[in-house]
Design a protein with these regions (language model features):
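ATP-dependent adenylation/nucleotidyltransferase module used to activate substrates
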Residues: 1-187
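Flexible domain-boundary/linker segments
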Residues: 47, 77, 147, 200, ...
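Short amphipathic alpha-helical patches
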Residues: 76, 180, 206-210, 231-237
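Short, structured secondary-structure boundary patches
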Residues: 79-87, 208-217
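Local cysteine-cluster metal-coordination motifs and their immediate loop/turn environment
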Residues: 111, 192-215
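Charge-dense, low-complexity polyampholytic segments
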Residues: 125, 130, 197-203, 222-230
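A polyampholytic, Gly/Pro-enriched intrinsically disordered region
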Residues: 186-190, 214-219
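Short Fe-S-cluster ligation motifs
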Residues: 212-213, 217, 223, 228-238
Length: 238
């Protein structure tokens, strides 16, 4: 029996990854791992991560990292205001991404995931692979979502853990619209995913994540079931 831990934020990428691991890679035993790092969207992220775990008959595990919010200057911090971005802002997603980037976040997440899988192995003698929903974003936007980063973290696993635990990013070479198409084929309920940095009941529609979510559905030619307070009307700039 194959065992997997999937890092999940309740977003399209990680929820699709969880479905892919369960349904296509045939991992029978699944753990959905969620991190509470004080993000402003904690409520919606946790809600949809839990729903994902329930749908896939997976165990839900939460790790607290609230100190990360205290040291971060990112807009995930509830104390900072999120401004509406224009269509022209989407021309330079690298600049916009900097505002939401949490330094070393994915490295911190994966080190904790490694500690979890090694602890499980010591106690239960069950070996777990670790899956992440990284997509093709480029080193300039998010340096901790690249193939090079995944390779280096795997190198770290080999020298820091007693067993060779693998970290796998199956969607890392494809874009958001491709992930949406894949998710549709796998039966992902996109209404039960979240992207918004604000984290209210309805997606704001104007933060970078909401803009890219709308753009992804548009180019995937898949109906977007999301309710937005502000909806994009023109995608011709992309």
């Amino acid at each position: 029996m194959k065992n997997a831990i999937v890092l999940c934020s309740g977003g399209i990428d990680s929820v699709t990854t969880a479905h892919y691991v369960k349904k296509k890679l045939n991992y029978a035993n699944l753990i959905v791992l969620f991190f509470d790092y004080g993000q402003r969207s904690i409520a919606s992220e946790k809600k949809f991560s839990r729903q994902c775990s329930k749908k896939l008959n997976a165990k839900f595990v939460e790790i607290q990292l609230k100190w990360l919010n205290e040291i971060s200057t990112s807009l995930i911090n509830k104390k900072r205001k999120v401004k509406k971005i224009s269509r022209n802002d989407l021309k330079n997603t690298e600049k916009e991404s900097e505002k939401y980037y949490v330094p070393c976040r994915n490295a911190i997440f994966l080190v904790h995931a490694l500690a979890l899988v090694e602890s499980i192995f010591i106690k239960e003698k069950k070996k777990y692979d670790i899956f992440v929903g990284f997509k093709n974003e480029g080193k300039e936007s998010y340096p901790d979502t690249t193939e090079e980063f995944v390779k280096k973290i795997n190198d770290l696993s080999q020298i820091s853990c007693q067993k060779n635990f693998k970290i796998i990013a199956p969607l890392i070479k494809i874009d958001k619209e491709d992930i949406i198409c894949l998710g549709e084929k796998l039966g992902v309920d996109f209404k039960k995913t979240t992207s918004c940095y604000i984290g209210e009941k309805e997606h704001c529609g104007f933060c970078l994540a909401c803009r890219l979510r709308q753009e992804g559905f548009y180019w995937a030619n898949v109906k977007d079931p999301t309710k937005y307070k502000t909806k994009m009307k023109d995608f011709r700039i992309v």
